Amino acid sequence: MKNNNSGKTSLYPEEKEEKILVDPYGRKVTGLRISITDRCNLSCMYCHNEGADCCSCGSLGHEMSPELICGIVREAAKFGVRKVKFSGGEPLFRKDFEEILACLPPLKEVSATTNGILLEKRAKTLKAAGLDRVNVSLDSLNPEKYGKITGAPPGTLEKVIKGIDSAVEAGLTPVKLNMVLLKGVNDNEIDAMMEFIRPYGGKVILQLIELMNIDPQLSKYMIDSKALEKILEERASEVRVRHLHHRKKYIIDGVEVEFVRPMDNSEFCAHCSRLRVTADGKFKPCLLVHDNLVDVREAKSPKEIEKLLRLAVSRRKPYYIPATGVTKLEKWQE
């Protein structure tokens, strides 16, 4: 078991099955995805704000304190949560991010998803505070196209690339480049992105992400995911399958490529092991469901956090269910 914070020992006995959080569909919860801010310095055309309704997006007042964030993680770790991913908004907008990282219990992996703009100057301090690795959003290597997708001013792409270099140098690896595929915009850049990461020698992975079509205006940008999967398989010398969401990893000419397909994908839901936490302190059982949130800010003690955590897990339900209508995980996998 990895120990992120020197001198600390594991808080949770690995072998005690009764400690594991399991939802009504048999899925174990072993990870948290925590949004620590809604603030961001980009306005990406496809952004879903981590499923938030964003009535208070951009507001400092509603963000969780470091104490609450760490309290949530400590309680979750007692019940089998091994991995935590921090997101936003842009998590590096939190000047106290290092403070948050430093107070976490020992975990298998602590990661963050960032747009990379502020990463160059903080990569080393984030690593020292306990961050293991980062995902960096990079949808295009073309400055003009990057600006069109993200709303970023000229010169931003160069900052992101410097941030990636700094992350690799600091040991925040493997760095995963999140590339949301947009038909007719950047879907012709996959090979260029693969060549971009090749010099990093396996320390950077390309993660292709299917557009989440939650806005009718985005429908025209949806790619043919099955066709792309077929091409990737044909070109790959090796195909591996990750447990998380049953994702496929393709080794193509020595470069590692993942393809994340969340839309209309019952396999994605069947293997989902994460519980989300919104920036304003609510457990969110599913990214695409908005009426079953659990407000953890009401908790006045660790025991109350545990109670609300269990309530949120009990509300987890797969958004996409196989056409058979079978909803028990063990049946899905037969």
Swiss-Prot record:
Cofactor binding notes? Binds 2 [4Fe-4S] clusters. Binds 1 [4Fe-4S] cluster coordinated with 3 cysteines and an exchangeable S-adenosyl-L-methionine and 1 [4Fe-4S] cluster coordinated with 3 cysteines and the GTP-derived substrate.
Binding residues annotated for GTP, in chain numbering: R33, K85, T113, K176, R274, L275, R276
- Which reaction is recorded as catalysed by this protein? GTP + AH2 + S-adenosyl-L-methionine = (8S)-3',8-cyclo-7,8-dihydroguanosine 5'-triphosphate + 5'-deoxyadenosine + L-methionine + A + H(+)
Domain Radical SAM core stretches = 24-256
UniProt cross-references to InterPro entries, sorted A to Z: Aldolase_TIM (IPR013785), Elp3/MiaA/NifB-like_rSAM (IPR006638), MoaA_arc (IPR013485), MoaA_NifB_PqqE_Fe-S-bd_CS (IPR000385), MoaA_twitch (IPR010505), MoCo_biosynth_MoaA/MoaC (IPR050105), rSAM (IPR007197)
Q: Using the chain's own numbering, where are the disulfide bonds?
A: none
The pathway entry for this protein reads as: Cofactor biosynthesis; molybdopterin biosynthesis
Cofactor field = [4Fe-4S] cluster
Q: Which Pfam families match?
A: Fer4_12, Mob_synth_C, Radical_SAM
Q: Which residues bind S-adenosyl-L-methionine?
A: Y46, G89, S137
Q: Give the record's keywords alphabetically.
A: 4Fe-4S, GTP-binding, Iron, Iron-sulfur, Lyase, Metal-binding, Molybdenum cofactor biosynthesis, Nucleotide-binding, S-adenosyl-L-methionine
This one is known as Probable GTP 3',8-cyclase
Q: Which organism is it from?
A: Methanosarcina acetivorans (strain ATCC 35395 / DSM 2834 / JCM 12185 / C2A)
UniProt gene name: moaA
